[in-house]
Amino acid sequence: MKFIDEAKIEVAAGKGGNGATSFRREKFVPRGGPDGGDGGKGGSVWAEADENTNTLVEYRFVKRYQAKNGEKGHGSDRYGAGADDIVLKMPVGTLIRDLDTDEIVADLTYHGQRVCLAKGGKGGLGNIHFKSSVNRAPKQSTPGEEGETRSLQLELKVLADVGLLGMPNAGKSTLITAVSAARPKIANYPFTTLHPNLGVVRIDENHSFVMADIPGLIEGAAEGAGLGHRFLKHLSRTGLLLHVVDLAPFDETVNPAEEALAIINELRKYDEELYGKPRWLVLNKLDMLDEEEARARTAAFLEAVGWDYPEPDDRFQFDMETPRLFQISALTHQGTQELVHQINQYLAEKKRIEAEKAEAEKAAANVEIIEQQPKTDTGVFKPE
């Protein structure tokens, strides 16, 4: 299936059915009272996040979604039937924006989440509602309300904990294959990856995280060169970036340090917030080098890029702010287990810190509410 991560659609809810003007027709009752029923509600249009849907391709072909109108009311106090709602299944991670107001209508972040995109109109009132002591035979009824209509921009940003960043052919697809069940296309030429791939990295029965591989970046990506610029947005929801570098390129004229600096430059030009995300360095393809050459190339690379990556004896004692360096071979799996265990540890600690911060903010808000409550002269809270 073709990977489509953007689409524009129009959604239109149904109109409510008109209320009925009707009177009872009974033998020997010359002036039967009003019995016109209400109209049915118009159908609404909903978006629902579906973990089994991976692309917005369907919305490239069908641009307009129209719910049906409600049925009109009937005599004998019979109400019109309401129209069925339309439910549009969208991938988890879809951002929905109103094209007219630029308002974010919904951010679908979990499976089963439902959001109303266009509300159906209410049914009109039948004349039974207008009977009064001075008007025993009202002829008025009301029309159904119009349903909402919206023009929407759909944008898919994949939900992943970790994002892979690097030049084409750096070995990102091989890495995601080595540590997860994902099976992206792999070949020894640039731009093998043409769309984002997601892999679930399972540490044990209770611990796992999602890794995203996007097409490789090249210089000028922020201005639209290559493929990666279209997919950089998919890294915006990640909590950690892995910058994968080919330490042993087949082309000896390629300078890994220059390529790495170009990647970071493109990242910064594209989005300052994305540039500021925690970023670990992963030097790949160690299987192509002997131990001495790998050490020499690593030292030369770090000196050329000017990045400071400490290497303590116990790597598991890193604090959250320290950048980390890993030397791996995705092909032979050398160093990959240490990498995924540290990622898991980092994400667990990050989650704990965020939970503590949220709890502290909640407690502070509760204190503020209490302090704002009026008190008596004795300091006792005064009831509202």
UniProtKB/Swiss-Prot annotation:
Full protein name: GTPase Obg
Cofactor: Mg(2+)
EC number: 3.6.5.-
Main location: cytoplasm
GO MF annotation: an example: GDP binding
Domain Obg per the UniProt entry, residue ranges: 1-159
Residues engaged in binding Mg(2+): 173, 193
GO cellular component, as recorded: cytoplasm
GO biological process, alphabetically ordered: ribosome biogenesis
Record-linked InterPro entries: G_OBG, GTP-bd, GTP-bd_Obg/CgtA, GTP1-OBG_CS, GTP1_OBG_dom, GTP1_OBG_dom_sf, OBG_GTPase, P-loop_NTPase
Subcellular location: Cytoplasm
Region (Disordered): 20-46, 129-149
Cited function: An essential GTPase which binds GTP, GDP and possibly (p)ppGpp with moderate affinity, with high nucleotide exchange rates and a fairly low GTP hydrolysis rate; the half-life of the GTP-bound state is about 50 minutes. Plays a role in control of the cell cycle, stress response, ribosome biogenesis and in those bacteria that undergo differentiation, in morphogenesis control.
Ranges annotated as biased composition (Gly residues): 33-43
Keywords: Cytoplasm, GTP-binding, Hydrolase, Magnesium, Metal-binding, Nucleotide-binding
Subunit structure: Monomer.
Family: Belongs to the TRAFAC class OBG-HflX-like GTPase superfamily. OBG GTPase family.
One Pfam assignment: GTP1_OBG
Organism per entry: Neisseria gonorrhoeae (strain ATCC 700825 / FA 1090)
Positions with a binding annotation for GTP: 166-173, 191-195, 213-216, 284-287, 329-331
Induction comment from the UniProt entry of this chain: Expressed constitutively, reaches maximum expression in early log phase and remains constant until stationary phase. Similar levels are seen when cells are grown under iron-limiting conditions, anoxically or in the presence of human serum, which mimic clinical infections (at protein level).
